[in-house]
Amino acid sequence: MVSGQPESTPDRARDMVVTVDNKERSRAAARSLKTIVDFAVGSHARAVAVLLAVALLGFLPGFFSIPPIDRDEARFAQATKQMVESGEYVDIRFQDEVRYKKPVGIYWLQAGVVKTASALGFPHALTTIWLYRIPSLIGAIAAVLLTYWAALAFVSRRAAVLAGLMMASCVLLGVERLIAKTDAMLLMTVVAAMGAMARAYLWQGRERPDASSAWTTAAVFWTALAAGVLLKGPLIVMVVGLAAIALIVVDRSASWVLSLKPLAGIVWLAILVLPWFLAIIGRAGDAFFAESVGGDLFGKVLASQESHGAPPGYYFILFWVTFWPGATLAALATPAVWRARHEPAIKFLLAWLVPSWLVLELVMTKLPHYVLPLYPAIAILIAGVIDARALSRKPFLVRGTLWWFVVPVAASVAGIGALAVIGRQFGLLAWPLMGGAAVMGFLAWRLYQADGAEHGLLRAVAAAILTAIAMFGVIVPSLGQLFPSATLVRILRESGCAHPQAAAVGYQEPSLVFLAGTPTRLTDTLGAAEFLRGGECRFAFIEAREERSFAQRAEALGVRYSAGPRIDAINISNGRPITIAVFRSIGSS
């Protein structure tokens, strides 16, 4: 894909201030990591097995133990729960409020998992959040494997494995796999579509594939496109469409598009996506398109929504954290990519990356995960340059490998500091994991010039996996203060009531509705007082700033109630400390 000279030589090791013993031990560890890659490149089955194992190591921590996360995850999960409860699989609602911002794809996937678990007798399936996360986990793992598959159109198997490892250890994907919403699954569909489109594009000037391969490639492309549309509407069309337009304009030819069987493909796309769109139009009229296109899509393009505005350059700045550890090599790979920009493979990957990135930087509403579908292109570009041994050797760029050490150290300080300040605990289980991550990051940086980029990247991947295990497997689940809804629902379950009911004032996050039940009333102080007056086993969760008003309303109505525990917590959706008082009704007045 690119050509160049080795990025370093063993002679550079003499400049490093490390002992011979330490170097030998580090190189032995590096050889062990390299042996794993050597094993993986032996066959496609081995490569898939290694990537699957690494992905599971990075993606499973916290998957089962972290409570519902406000707000998006809880909103998606609650809407799915209502589908299962009501048997209504066309209309999308959060309590009585319609949710027409996104199509139905993710809700159907989550509902399928939850209904299957319920049918198998899984207890409390409707309120078990990790069941709703399974599609995201599958999407994230599939995205890693599909990155490997897509990369094989451009680079060697070894480089494709490295690209997959970069995605498996990527910070942003490591977060999205944990959240029960659309983005990990969307990434999967984009990588599948772009991998198929790459093969169609790169067939130009080569021996044509047999008819079976051509039709299979086209089927993958159009099926992935349809799935992406059902998951998140036009975003996948933007990524694929802008890439295709860029290639057509640069090459002044669109002949390769015929390899994707566009006529049959469009018919297949319509067969897959139109039934639900017609059903929702029949149910809601033009309300769905008014909210999803007019309110959500155009609203995000033309104005910042929900305080998520940021200037152009936002994604570029975040990239160095959200694509860590792979991002550390991006600057070193850029000169080689630029030199090879006219090669078909590089041209395609840049068309995948650049146009959509520029559009997203210009859109007013910005969220970190919007650029996730573009990260596989970056991973493949970097992996190709590593494989060609063409990374830049300019000292000021090489010094950037310090970032491999900085991130795990910063994560250690932040994570253990949060345990001490918020959780008031030492978090001893996290210390060896974070320490190991810092050591691997240090060695990745310090021995980069001695051992080369591949060894450095593999050490950094190990650092990323250890960091993920510590942060998501130990630290975050220990911070119960970040998840007050789980604490409040625990109070309900321990109340001795068979069917407790709840109302909430002030603190009204979606996770409370998901865990406490769809009938949970989100109201004001008067509504809470009237709610308690309605019978026994009723609970009111009142944020401290509303407590005086509630007491006055309850007294005026003659409501009899008892005071329960008070909860000091942090509202994770806005980062603010909150205190919630619990009140329980005493019969009807």
Can you annotate each of these PLM segments?
Residues 2-7, 15-396, 571-579:
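Membrane-integral, polyisoprenol-dependent glycosyltransferases
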Residues 4-7, 17-25, 32-33, 215, ...:
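Membrane-embedded architecture of ER/inner-membrane glycosylation machinery
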